[in-house]
A protein has these predicted regions:
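Ordered, small/hydrophobic-rich secondary-structure cores
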Residues: 1-28
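Short, structural beta-strand-to-alpha-helix junction motif
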Residues: 2-4, 32, 102-103
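Short alpha-helical interface patches
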Residues: 7-11, 36-44, 104-112
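Acidic, low-complexity, intrinsically disordered interaction modules
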Residues: 22-93, 115-177
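Intrinsic disorder/low-complexity detector
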Residues: 91-102
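Short acidic DE-rich linear segments
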Residues: 181-182
Length: 182
């Protein structure tokens, strides 16, 4: 069984911005998971999970005006990093280990190829950092997914350190794993 949105949403941190994208390019941005209308995407399948910079209203109480342009030049919006979840009507042909719980081996093929992952063990909160998805070793494969979020990356490349705005390039994806299921 493939991963559906109704399953993955249980693991996404409540305090991160989200960009829900569809394979056709249409997307909707949310400040928090709680802002997504209940069951809106539950029937859709996860195609991928990553990080992206997306536009948000400077006034969190209003919806940004549609610019109608490919290049957004509105003074009413700002770009902010978000967890990106790409959804599809049809599941990807990825075999899961089991349908009862989400193991890291089942999540890994859906993760963005790179950059900057922190894999955290919930039991002792130790972490290891990996630049690319392919660098994450198999030793985590049988661990249960406990959470997915984003945090500031302390070892940002020099170019991005000097940028005075918030961007996904200053973040890393955090994947919390546990020996026990959630």
């Amino acid at each position: 069984m493939a991963i559906q949105f109704k399953e993955i949403k249980k693991y996404i941190a409540r305090n991160v911005r989200l960009s829900i994208n569809h394979k056709d390019g249409y997307y909707e941005n949310y400040l928090f998971m709680a802002d997504i209308p209940e069951q809106k995407y539950d029937h859709l399948y996860v195609y991928g999970i990553g990080m992206i910079d997306v536009e948000f209203s400077n006034d969190v109480y209003t919806v940004p005006a549609k610019s109608g342009e490919a290049v957004i030049t509105s003074k009413d919006i700002t770009l902010k990093p978000a967890i990106e979840i790409v959804l599809s009507e049809k599941p990807r042909p990825i075999q899961r280990s089991n349908d009862k719980e989400l193991l890291f081996r089942d999540l890994k093929p859906y993760l963005q190829n790179g950059r900057n992952f922190a894999v955290v063990k919930r039991e002792d909160w130790s972490s290891e950092i990996y630049e690319l998805r392919r660098d994450i070793p198999e030793k985590y494969d049988n661990m249960h997914v406990y959470g997915i979020g984003m945090e500031d990356h302390p070892w940002v490349e020099e170019y991005w350190r000097d940028v005075d705005y918030e961007t996904m390039h200053k973040k890393r994806m955090v994947i919390v794993l546990s020996e026990q299921s959630k």
